[in-house]
């Protein structure tokens, strides 16, 4: 019932709050808070794909700017991306801006021709498979839970792949007591 939202996060999240709650005032204490991935696609790139494929749906990960969302046919989260892409009538899908999440969706929905641009989340993308393997060797009983924004080599090592909320739910319900978590800090 509040009328003012104070959003302490990156700018695209504040923009999303404005889009989802246009009747509310959204305040962003730090307008410089930004996510590099949110800008890793251009209108020209999207136009090139749209010119090349008649049957194209542009699917945008929610972690992007309002402008990029406006170029898209549908906006998804990491929790619902696979289900939404699977239900689209289009054969050709341009997934923007996160190539790693796009590759994950492509692997889960092989009936679609999922194409990506070279965008990525710097936090998730910098995780390397060898780091995960080293942690697995140190903690052999631990389950590996990663976000689908991680690169494909890291995702291949995971016991569970899911959104942040999915990882938390999985770890809470698992009989295991030790986890290697491949996502942003604070999910532990």
Q: What would you call each of these model-derived segments?
A:
Residues 1-188:
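Active-site loop-to-helix "anion-binding N-cap" substructures in soluble metabolic enzymes
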